[in-house]
Structures are given as structure tokens and as C-alpha cells.
């Protein structure tokens, strides 16, 4: 896999490799530092909402390593080299050209605009990839910060759904054209 990195003024995003996912799941901070060059908050654990899907991501990476950019990305502060969270795609674009994006910050890094900055950059990256026409996210109606991030990056609500675990979920989306116009 090539060394893909996306940079913003304050942040760097890099797709997690199979070895990095293994170290994260094992809680091995020294190995993570060696593999990523990034310091992780203690105790070593995936960012919120990433713990459950990470074993599945590991299996996908084992089968299709070339798809690593379509799964989980580590978000780190460029200046301090600290892990602040994760942004993830739900896999490569579907037949309609849509990809799903999700994001989570470690608690101590919430409220600093990192999620908005990272998600905006990753949406821009996604639209540079062949076949991507739309980026979507799902946010529970009660998760005001997630809704705010979606709106701040130019997404608009397009549907709602019911989730057994979290209740009503809004589906937000942005198209390649709308993303360029909001830049």
C-alpha cells in the first residue's frame, strides 16, 4: 500500500494498516507509536464508536489490503503528533457512487473543530477518487455535535431511518458539485 496522507492546517490523516489495527486492538501503545509516529491517549483504546467495527476492519484488510483507504483513518495533530480521533469510510463507493463516512474524536479533543476539519478534508479526498459522486453520514437525532459537523462540512439531511440501538438517525449527504461550491 502506498503511503497516503491527507493534511490540513492542524491535522494529518492516514489510513490504518493491518499492523496498526492489530496494535490498537491489543492496546499496545509502544507498537502504535513505532508504527504511526503518533502518541495515543492512555489507556490505549480505539476512539469512541470504533471499538466494535475494528475487528471487522482487520478482517477486510487481511482480505483486501488495497482497500485500506476506504476503512479507518487515524487523525493526529501535526504539531504535537498526538492521536485525536478517527475518520472512517464504510468501504469503496457503491454502484451509485456513494460512500459512507463516520468520525469520532477522543473525548479530550472534542470541541476544538478537529472533526469538522478532518471530515471536510476527507470528503475532498473522497471526491478525488474515481467513481465517488456522493458522501453520506448517519447521525442520531440526539447527537448534536455529529449533526453540527455534518452541516459544517456542507452536508444536508436527505432521509431519516430508525436504528434499533440509537433510535432515529438522520442521513446527511453532499455531492461532488455541492462540495466544490461550498469550498
Tell where the protein language model's regions lie, with residue ranges.
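Short, surface-exposed beta-strand segments enriched in small/polar/acidic residues
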Residues: 98, 136-137
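Glycine-rich acyl-CoA binding loop
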Residues: 113-116
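GNAT-family acyltransferases
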Residues: 1-100, 104-108, 121-129, 142, ...
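Conserved active-site tyrosine of GNAT-family acetyltransferases
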Residues: 150
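Conserved beta-strand-loop-alpha-helix junction that forms the acyl-donor binding cleft
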Residues: 137-147
